[in-house]
């Protein structure tokens, strides 16, 4: 494919070398004449192992050249990758001046181009940037319609400095955010020979995926450091602790606990997070990430309450009171906390949880349910259909499979709030998810 790459910094230069190395005809574009001269001499403008050889081979074979002329590059290629920088402002927001200027020039070049062109944003931009900034500028300066006259896609990069070429050739996945199917197909064809899954999503989803991955990486580093600091204060080698923690691929390093939803609860997590946070404070150890977990957890319960409250109806059904399906354990249950909030605010609440109801009458937790939370116990009902019928707002509190149908087929005249993830997809209908 004929590809132009705008911005020849770390991302752009690596992409230029790797794409030309795989047989594509590449035109590198940069405002720096010095960088363009280096590219045309087959030299790398950055320090990256193996890149110089790739660029030299690309120039030697005629598959790679550089230019400062945006129009020339757009007219000579089928697809353009925007790899320009998006530095931080003093307030933490993104500086989009480079993106905006390139889009203006690219839009002007597209005005006179008859062949369909695809614009790919590889720069890291916040969700909404392509729809609210990139596309409007391209359409204004080209006089054309995105998704009709030209294609638009997002292709976040996951390259690490010093291992960028290996990361390009052996990615964990290739993420494509597509405005239209044709744009996604054209971009996907570039990566077809890589041994990695190609994930095609909407543009905003792809933008968010990039930030989520980077923030997750930063979170892991910070978490390990805080654990290490607390461990050292306890006379323990934090490296030894984390080595064993990382051996667990079933829970610790897995998809488990990695789905948005309601807050965590149960007998272990809240208690242990609180205990470790307290001990860190006692030892004068700064652990702001770990110390923030309980506050963040409480905020998620508050968000669930706010979602219920905004509907205006006072008749609410809470389906699931225990912190997870298949148990009667109410210790630190966020569902129980939510119920307490609703009761305290005067909602007419009815609750269905057959496990908790059974435990109240027959189980070991009966004393607690009847004597410690009698105001909640009195609201438990045994007829699911009746509970649903008498409510205006139905809250799916835990993953009891009996509740799933309500998210997919909302009863007429009802609102469903899904705290679990039963909804098959985000919709604008009568069902709403806490994070979707």
From Swiss-Prot:
Enzyme class per UniProt: oxidoreductase
Gene source species: Azotobacter vinelandii
Residues that, per the record, bind GDP-alpha-D-mannuronate: 161, 210, 214, 217, 225, 256-257, 259, 265, 324
Keyword vocabulary terms for this entry: Alginate biosynthesis, NAD, Oxidoreductase
Protein residues bound to NAD(+): 10-11, 30, 35, 86, 124, 271, 331
EC number, as in UniProt: 1.1.1.132
Reactions this protein catalyses: GDP-alpha-D-mannose + 2 NAD(+) + H2O = GDP-alpha-D-mannuronate + 2 NADH + 3 H(+)
Protein task: Catalyzes the oxidation of guanosine diphospho-D-mannose (GDP-D-mannose) to GDP-D-mannuronic acid, a precursor for alginate polymerization. The alginate layer causes a mucoid phenotype and is essential for cyst formation.
Domain of life: Bacteria
Biological process, per Gene Ontology: alginic acid biosynthetic process
Pfam families: UDPG_MGDP_dh, UDPG_MGDP_dh_C, UDPG_MGDP_dh_N
Active site: 268
Gene3D superfamilies assigned to the protein according to its UniProt record, in alphabetical order: 1.20.5.170, NAD(P)-binding Rossmann-like Domain
Disulfide bond annotation, renumbered to this chain: none
Kinase listed as a keyword: no
Pathway named in the protein's UniProt entry: Glycan biosynthesis; alginate biosynthesis
Protein name: GDP-mannose 6-dehydrogenase
Recorded GO MF terms: GDP-mannose 6-dehydrogenase activity; NAD binding
Family from the record: Belongs to the UDP-glucose/GDP-mannose dehydrogenase family.
């Amino acid at each position: 494919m004929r590809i132009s790459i705008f911005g020849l910094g770390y991302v752009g230069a690596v992409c230029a070398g790797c794409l030309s190395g795989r047989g594509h005809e590449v035109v590198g574009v940069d405002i720096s004449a010095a960088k363009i001269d280096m590219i045309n001499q087959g030299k790398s403008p950055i320090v990256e192992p193996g890149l110089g050889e790739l660029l030299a081979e690309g120039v030697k074979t005629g598959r790679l050249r550089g230019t400062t002329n945006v129009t020339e590059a757009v007219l000579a290629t089928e697809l353009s990758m925007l790899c320009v920088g998006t530095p931080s402002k003093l307030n933490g927001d993104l500086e989009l001046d480079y993106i905006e200027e390139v889009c203006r020039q690219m839009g002007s070049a597209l005005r006179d181009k008859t062949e369909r062109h695809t614009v790919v944003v590889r720069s890291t931009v916040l969700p909404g940037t392509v729809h609210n900034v990139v596309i409007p500028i391209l359409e204004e300066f080209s006089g054309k319609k995105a998704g009709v006259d030209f294609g638009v896609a997002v292709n976040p990069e996951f390259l690490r400095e010093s291992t960028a070429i290996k990361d390009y050739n052996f990615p964990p996945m290739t993420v494509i955010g597509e405005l239209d199917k044709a744009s996604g197909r054209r971009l996907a064809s570039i990566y077809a020979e890589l041994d990695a899954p190609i994930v095609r999503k909407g543009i905003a989803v792809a933008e968010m995926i990039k930030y989520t991955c980077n923030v997750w990486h930063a979170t892991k580093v910070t978490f390990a450091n805080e654990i290490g600091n607390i461990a050292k204060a306890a006379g323990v080698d934090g490296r030894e602790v984390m080595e064993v923690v990382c051996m667990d691929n079933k829970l610790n390093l897995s998809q488990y606990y990695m789905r948005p939803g309601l807050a965590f609860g149960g007998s272990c997590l809240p208690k242990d997070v609180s205990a470790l946070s307290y001990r860190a404070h006692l030892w004068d150890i700064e652990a702001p990430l770990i110390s923030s977990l309980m506050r963040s957890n409480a905020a998620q319960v508050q968000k669930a309450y706010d979602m219920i409250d905004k509907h205006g109806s006072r008749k609410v059904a809470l389906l699931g009171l225990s912190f997870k399906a298949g148990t009667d354990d109410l210790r630190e249950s966020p569902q129980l906390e939510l119920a307490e909030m609703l009761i305290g605010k005067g909602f007419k609440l009815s609750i269905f949880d057959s496990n908790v109801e059974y435990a109240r009458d027959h189980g070991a937790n009966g004393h607690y349910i009847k004597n410690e939370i009698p105001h909640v116990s009195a609201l438990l009902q045994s007829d699911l259909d009746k509970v649903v019928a008498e409510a205006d707002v139905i809250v799916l509190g835990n993953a009891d499979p009996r509740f799933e149908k309500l998210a997919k087929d909302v009863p007429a005249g009802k609102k469903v709030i899904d705290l679990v993830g039963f909804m098959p997809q985000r919709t604008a209908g009568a069902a709403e998810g806490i994070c979707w």
